[in-house]
Amino acid sequence: MPLAQLADPWQKMAVESPSDSAENGQQIMDEPMGEEEINPQTEEVSIKEIAITHHVKEGHEKADPSQFELLKVLGQGSFGKVFLVKKISGSDARQLYAMKVLKKATLKVRDRVRTKMERDILVEVNHPFIVKLHYAFQTEGKLYLILDFLRGGDLFTRLSKEVMFTEEDVKFYLAELALALDHLHSLGIIYRDLKPENILLDEEGHIKLTDFGLSKESIDHEKKAYSFCGTVEYMAPEVVNRRGHTQSADWWSFGVLMFEMLTGTLPFQGKDRKETMTMILKAKLGMPQFLSPEAQSLLRMLFKRNPANRLGAGPDGVEEIKRHSFFSTIDWNKLYRREIHPPFKPATGRPEDTFYFDPEFTAKTPKDSPGIPPSANAHQLFRGFSFVAITSDDESQAMQTVGVHSIVQQLHRNSIQFTDGYEVKEDIGVGSYSVCKRCIHKATNMEFAVKIIDKSKRDPTEEIEILLRYGQHPNIITLKDVYDDGKYVYVVTELMKGGELLDKILRQKFFSEREASAVLFTITKTVEYLHAQGVVHRDLKPSNILYVDESGNPESIRICDFGFAKQLRAENGLLMTPCYTANFVAPEVLKRQGYDAACDIWSLGVLLYTMLTGYTPFANGPDDTPEEILARIGSGKFSLSGGYWNSVSDTAKDLVSKMLHVDPHQRLTAALVLRHPWIVHWDQLPQYQLNRQDAPHLVKGAMAATYSALNRNQSPVLEPVGRSTLAQRRGIKKITSTAL
């Protein structure tokens, strides 16, 4: 099976040298090619002047620099800068873009040609998996390209550091990439620079192919290009020996990417550039046997040194690849329409967040002026239209040690103090390890909330990652900023001006089942979304469900406080895609995850019970002891008849009983709650006022007592280590730590 067989799925694998035989693996290479013209120093350049004309976004007016507000510097080099910009006029006002600004005077002729090429190719291209050029214009001294601002980072560095994936997951990305390449080929464009950093993720997790500076337009399939360009490890043999190459070269590079995604290593990588090129031309490569037969077959058909024999090079083009058995489960039409959910959603945060960009640039004041040429070891100008700054070797090693928490560590490199940007106001709430305060952003005078977390008491990493990854959901609290002063972490979020959901509902004199159904639908839909992503909240008490404004509309509900939330992870700490979870996760891990998800539903059942009757199911008031409350919860007994229940419909009672079932395995899942008749047929529910207990202070006290009893730090009863099924399965004699 793929990747699951490796303790570390991204460990280096031994690749045979040209002289080695491949006794342990099946050979996938055909005849070696000569190396008549290996010369990594040469590159053919067309010497010609160019004129970049304007390009205007369809349905919009002609653009110029004055229409864009500079927000941040994303990258800088000797002949230009890349800015995060906001359009300030026109029908797309407030839209964020990446603006690539090139100073004509410092552009070499070669770079001018490449800039023209980027612009011309992007004008022709309109595809869901290719970066889009929205505007192109020039002033007397500068060239401007206005492009998609892609916040997800590049596919490989993000997923290799954060996520465990399977062949099924890899298949999704390769399929989207195949459609993007085919579209370019249909326009007569050879991509030629296919490499990991040129495959970006948008905020949903779909790919975007970027950086067309090395692409070469050809008139037809027989037209060959001879320039020596691209990244050597991904080059096809015919590119290396400069005999001329066609679009078939891209399918070789496609195979290299596939091999790298499935094994974590490059198929051809020598100690230097020349040795790598020799390996590409002559080396035999053993096929990793943990790959499926379908994956091995596709790799063999892509790694043909004769480009005419390569899959995708025939008259049917990409259809040959789409028909291959490796892609048999892909619905290509649904894929093109972006109807297939990506395996992984990047932690992108707000639209204007630049967490994947180097703070060396993003901390600078944005000014549209020529950049000072960087020193020899400064960051490279751009990595394609994604503008993700390349890290130095030292930083690269540091990033590898950061591991799964790299996103948060990157956030915390901000040296600015929280109080420099915000004015702290009164307390909103106080917890055992944090305090929440109202604060005002000094630059904009806007109100926010800040959760100040004591790092000695709790690691906020998981909470911040979850908010970054899922905070764009309309009913999850939005993360605005993060600061770390060493002792405390300051998590800035939108301010919940509408207060707690239960407060508002209990104060509302007129409240019907139809309104209760709309509220529960909104919350459960959000919880279902989290559970589908492998996230459990684990603290869904009513005080963590609030309104962002005072409208009282279900759309303004926000689930807050992810301090106890968990993301499903593998033993090595990497996140797991749904496909990985289904295939390779230990039963006890899934059991725990299922239990936590069932606890989330139980909490929503308590909320529903209280909304309908005005009192809680397991506590009569704030004076009930924890023992009394826990005994009632454990018995699973609660009343659904008489008194205030007389005004409640039978379908509502049925849903409450199934959400509060004492056995978590028999409790409804979030998806089943959403399919319950009381939710589905909300428009048929009674609109008359529910007859509820009118004692909000008692309900608040009883609810607080309920969750206080549940969250008590009880001393666990420990049994002998040998009794543990996990210990028995692994043959462990001694357990050094226990996670409860």
UniProtKB/Swiss-Prot annotation:
Composition skew (Polar residues), residue ranges: 18-27
Domain AGC-kinase C-terminal, chain residue ranges per copy: 328-397
Binding site for ATP: 74-82, 100, 428-436, 451
Resulting phenotype, residue 416 to V: In a breast cancer sample; somatic mutation
PTM summary: Activated by phosphorylation at Ser-227 by PDPK1. Autophosphorylated on Ser-386, as part of the activation process. May be phosphorylated at Thr-365 and Ser-369 by MAPK1/ERK2 and MAPK3/ERK1. Can also be activated via phosphorylation at Ser-386 by MAPKAPK2.
Assembly and interaction partners: Forms a complex with either MAPK1/ERK2 or MAPK3/ERK1 in quiescent cells. Transiently dissociates following mitogenic stimulation. Interacts with NFATC4, ETV1/ER81 and FGFR1.
Modified residues (Phosphothreonine): 365
Modified residues (Phosphoserine): 227, 369, 375, 386, 415, 556, 715
Family: Belongs to the protein kinase superfamily. AGC Ser/Thr protein kinase family. S6 kinase subfamily.
Name of this chain's protein: Ribosomal protein S6 kinase alpha-3
Any GO BP annotation: regulation of translation in response to stress
Spans annotated as Disordered: 1-38
Name of a matching Pfam family: Pkinase_C
Subcellular location: Nucleus; Cytoplasm
Chain positions found as Phosphotyrosine: 529
Activity modulation notes: Upon extracellular signal or mitogen stimulation, phosphorylated at Thr-577 in the C-terminal kinase domain (CTKD) by MAPK1/ERK2 and MAPK3/ERK1. The activated CTKD then autophosphorylates Ser-386, allowing binding of PDPK1, which in turn phosphorylates Ser-227 in the N-terminal kinase domain (NTDK) leading to the full activation of the protein and subsequent phosphorylation of the substrates by the NTKD.
Annotated catalytic residues: 193 (proton acceptor), 539 (proton acceptor)
Cofactor requirements of the protein: Mg(2+)
InterPro entries assigned: AGC-kinase_C (IPR000961), Kinase-like_dom_sf (IPR011009), Pkinase_C (IPR017892), Prot_kinase_dom (IPR000719), Protein_kinase_ATP_BS (IPR017441), Ribosomal_S6_kinase_II (IPR016239), RPS6KA3_C (IPR041905), RSK_N (IPR041906)
Tissue specificity statement from the Swiss-Prot or TrEMBL entry: Expressed in many tissues, highest levels in skeletal muscle.
Top-level taxon in the UniProt lineage: Eukaryota
Protein keywords: ATP-binding, Cell cycle, Cytoplasm, Disease variant, Intellectual disability, Kinase, Magnesium, Metal-binding, Nucleotide-binding, Nucleus, Phosphoprotein, Repeat, Serine/threonine-protein kinase, Stress response, Transferase
GO molecular function: ATP binding; magnesium ion binding; protein kinase activity; protein kinase binding; protein serine kinase activity; protein serine/threonine kinase activity; ribosomal protein S6 kinase activity
Organism expressing this protein natively: Homo sapiens
